[in-house]
Amino acid sequence: MAHKKAGGSTRNGRDSESKRLGVKCFGGELVNAGGIIVRQRGTRFHPGANVGCGRDHTLFALTTGKIQFEVKGPKNRKFVSIVAE
C-alpha cells in the first residue's frame, strides 16, 4: 500500500510586521509644516529649531523650510532643525 507519513508541525514561521522607521526627509530638502521628518523608536534624533516631537518620538516640521541635520552638545547628539526659506 502507498502510505505517506504525516508531516511534523513546526513552531517557527512568525515575524512581526516592519514598522517603516527611519529618516523620511533628508538634509537640504524642502519640507512643509506638519511634514514627517524622522520616524523613530526613542530619541535617536532630537528636535531642534522649528521641529516638534510626537508621542511616539516622531519628528515633524512646525514651519515650512529646509531641513538641517547637526551634531552638537557635549554628548554629540544629533539634532534636526528647520531653516526658514
Curated annotation (Swiss-Prot):
Q: Name one GO cellular component term.
A: cytosolic large ribosomal subunit
List each coiled-coil range: none
Q: Which UniProt keywords apply?
A: Ribonucleoprotein, Ribosomal protein
One Gene Ontology molecular-function label: structural constituent of ribosome
Spell out the PROSITE patterns in the cross-references: RIBOSOMAL_L27 (PS00831)
Highest taxon of the lineage:
Bacteria
A Gene Ontology annotation in the biological process aspect, one of them, is: translation
Q: Which SUPFAM superfamilies match?
A: Ribosomal L27 protein-like
Spell out the Pfam families in the cross-references.
Ribosomal_L27
| Matching InterPro entries | Ribosomal_bL27, Ribosomal_bL27_CS
HAMAP family per record: Ribosomal_bL27
Family to which the UniProt record says this protein belongs = Belongs to the bacterial ribosomal protein bL27 family.
According to UniProt, the name of this protein is: Large ribosomal subunit protein bL27
